[in-house]
Design a protein with these regions (language model features):
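Sec-dependent N-terminal signal peptides of Gram-positive bacterial secreted proteins and lipoproteins
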Residues: 1-17
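Linear, non-domain "peripheral" regions
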Residues: 17-142, 312-314, 328-331, 337, ...
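Secondary-structure boundary elements
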Residues: 130-189
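Alpha-helix capping and helix-loop boundary segments enriched in small/acidic/polar residues
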Residues: 131, 191-195, 217-219
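Solvent-exposed loop/turn segments at secondary-structure junctions
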Residues: 167-172, 176, 195-197, 221-225, ...
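A short, highly charged nucleic-acid-interacting micro-segment common to nuclease
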Residues: 186-200
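Hydrophobic/aromatic-rich core segments of domains that either
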Residues: 199-266
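His-Asp-centered catalytic microenvironments across diverse enzyme cores
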Residues: 237-333
Length: 362
């Protein structure tokens, strides 16, 4: 007896509020993308065990095949389960027929734009990119070359990428309840100038790789909401970096803070949660921005020294972080500038709690 088999699996791990609409949007988007080279894989040998099947499926996904046709002996739908490959990177559908215990199945794959972009770098082939993705990819290559020509240390390259993203783009769109799928993509962030956390993290990820950095994306939650950020390896030790959280809302392209730049597990876990078994442990503090530059104030005297040192160098923007020391109001800072000849002082930061502050004077 022949049975018709039809299964569809859509990845469900897109990072924003109201994810259902974003997933539906992706489903519609991948069916209309133009300008991509399509490929099909046909396995001439029958599959006799699940490990052989998994290897073939992984090969198809890694090569971004559009279809994979197979014959499976002793087929059991519960064993040959495509949910095994659940990922935000790929949507998989399966159609075919089962006669007795032999199944003839064609799997179809649709790939997230971010996956195609990252794989283009990893494989060195841009054949799978559509026209818009190709233009953005080349723009990122140019940016990475610019950064590498200016900086030699991994820390400086990382900071340059962080600062580029924070000062160039903004979080959004903020005028819709559910951000469109495009707002989750590298392409959307670069070409539209705005995006959500996934776009920020994936852009940091691919630029980091292009600059030779050991960087990866990490998924979890921030204050209970699905979120994506990054982990970077510097001098053999790992750090968290959340570029999205360092970009102020509403956007201020002139403001740079580093509250989430190279944090330990303990530091970032104040607001973030994740499956710690799936990612490297982050315990180092050397390359935390404020530690690295000596911009940590634990009392009034240390804050005074930080400000005076910056002013002596002619700096008009001063950043620092308080630890075990609370600034209750802007007056706590303004008093340090009295008699120094400035007509305006612009301060950003959360008074009444420890954290990062930025001061601009003129």
């Amino acid at each position: 007896m022949k049975k018709i088999l039809s299964i569809f699996l859509l990845c469900q791990n897109v990072f924003a509020d109201n994810l259902g609409d974003a997933i539906t949007a992706w489903k519609n988007l991948v069916s209309t993308v133009k300008g991509i080279t399509y490929s099909a894989i046909n396995s001439s040998l029958p599959i006799k065990d699940v490990e052989q099947w998994k290897a073939l499926m992984n090969e198809a996904i890694n090569n971004q095949a559009d279809t994979l046709s197979v014959t499976i002996v002793n087929f059991d739908q519960n064993v040959y389960d495509i949910t095994t490959f659940r990922s935000y990177d790929v949507a998989i559908s399966a159609k075919g027929s089962v006669t007795g215990t032999i199944a003839n199945i064609t799997y179809s794959f649709s790939y997230h734009s971010n996956y195609r972009m990252t794989r283009a770098y990893e494989t060195g082939s841009k054949d799978k990119l559509n026209v818009e993705e190709l233009a953005v990819y080349d723009k990122l290559v140019t940016k990475a070359q610019e950064i590498k020509s200016q900086y030699t240390s991994d820390f400086d390259k990382e900071k340059a990428i962080h600062d580029y993203i924070v000062t160039t783009f903004k979080y959004g769109p903020l005028d819709v309840e559910t951000p469109p799928l495009r707002a989750h993509t590298i392409v959307g962030l670069i070409n539209d100038g705005e995006g959500v956390c996934e776009a920020y993290a994936q852009t940091f990820n691919i630029l980091g790789k292009m600059c030779g950095l050991d960087v990866q994306c990490i998924t979890g939650k921030m204050e209970g909401v699905s979120h994506m950020w990054n982990i970077i390896k510097l001098d053999g030790e790992y750090y968290h970096v959340d570029v999205t959280s360092d970009d102020p809302t509403p956007d201020d392209g002139n403001r740079l803070i580093y509250s989430n730049f190279n944090l330990t597990d303990e530091q970032i876990s104040e607001k973030h949660t994740w499956d710690t078994s799936q990612f490297p442990k982050c315990t180092a503090t050397k390359y935390n921005y404020y530690d690295y530059y000596g911009l940590v104030a634990t009392n009034y005297s240390e804050l005074q020294n930080i400000i005076n040192s910056a002013l002596s160098k002619g700096q008009k923007t001063i950043t620092f972080e308080t630890r075990n020391y609370i600034l209750n109001s802007s007056n706590d800072i303004k008093s340090l500038f009295q008699g120094k000849g400035f007509s305006s002082i612009y301060i950003t930061g959360d008074f009444g709690e420890v954290g990062a502050f930025s001061i601009t004077v003129s």
